[in-house]
Structures are given as C-alpha cells and as structure tokens.
C-alpha cells in the first residue's frame, strides 16, 4: 500500500483492476476542508488518461512491476521472440503487445519489458535508435538542412520524415517516442 501523499510522477498504482501510472500530481490544501491530491493517471494497459482526486493520506494499492532486459532475437509467424539476457528464457510477444514500437525492432536490439503478475504490460524501446535508410526520393543539389522534409523507409519498414539531403544507405537516428528524425549517425 502507498499513501496518496507519497505519489510522484511515474508511481504505479492498482485501481479498479487496472495498473495506472501517475503522470501529474498536485497536493491541494484548501483554506476550508481537508487536503487532497489531484492526479492525472495513465493506464499502462491501454494508454487512457483520467483525472482522479484522492484524500490526503488515502492508502492505495501500489502495483508491483517487474522489469526485464530482453533481446529481440527473431520473428516467427507474427510473434516477436525475445531472450532474457540472464536466464536465456524465450518470451513471445505479439505486435499488439509491443504496440507502435514493433516497427522499430530489429534483431539483436535490447528492450525493457515490464511485467505485472506474469503478464506483459509494456515494452520500452530505447529513446533513440540508429537505422539505415532503405528507400527515399533522391537528393537534389541545393537541398539544405533548413529546407523541407520527405518520407523515408527504414531497414525495419518504419516510415519517418527526413530532411531533403538524406539519401538511401545513410544511417540516421530516430526518436522512437514520436517517430522523428534526430540526425545523421557517423
């Protein structure tokens, strides 16, 4: 159990049979009446965001999460196979369980998988990854860094918008949170 006074950004709690992560919290102490904690909670399972108010000092069930560092080894019949780097056990996850990050997975990539009661809740990819551009429109002389953008398809099949000067075969860094181009990789 955790007190609502101990909420911090990132704290995970169990509420109504779901696991929620505290995104924002604010301790409010009105002049009249008792203090309370106003929170914004995000469901770890489906990403829904709700606002909920707790009485100050109210006890809430804290969610116990296990984080494992797994390495993506291969894809078999639509399932992504991961190997635990310490116990060498294999874990199979569907693209629905992985979420939008599935388009960035390549063999040998390490990810953090978060479990709750033996079930996969979330797959955390590295914030930025380096991938090779396999398909894009050719660059034209005079394209500059401050100009426009064009679509590019990466080695994993993901599509991102890149500057006009990027060409096929280049290695680029991509932000996996918002699918944005971060820069060239040397």
From Swiss-Prot:
The highest taxon in the source lineage is Bacteria
Keyword line:
Cytoplasm, Elongation factor, Protein biosynthesis
Instruction: Kindly list the residue ranges recorded as spanning the membrane.
Output: none
Where does this protein act, in terms of pathway? Protein biosynthesis; polypeptide chain elongation
Where does the record say this protein resides?
Cytoplasm
Family of the protein in this entry = Belongs to the elongation factor P family.
Protein name stated in the entry:
Elongation factor P
Supply the source organism for this entry.
Prochlorococcus marinus (strain MIT 9301)
Question: Taxonomic lineage of this organism?
Answer: Bacteria, Bacillati, Cyanobacteriota, Cyanophyceae, Synechococcales
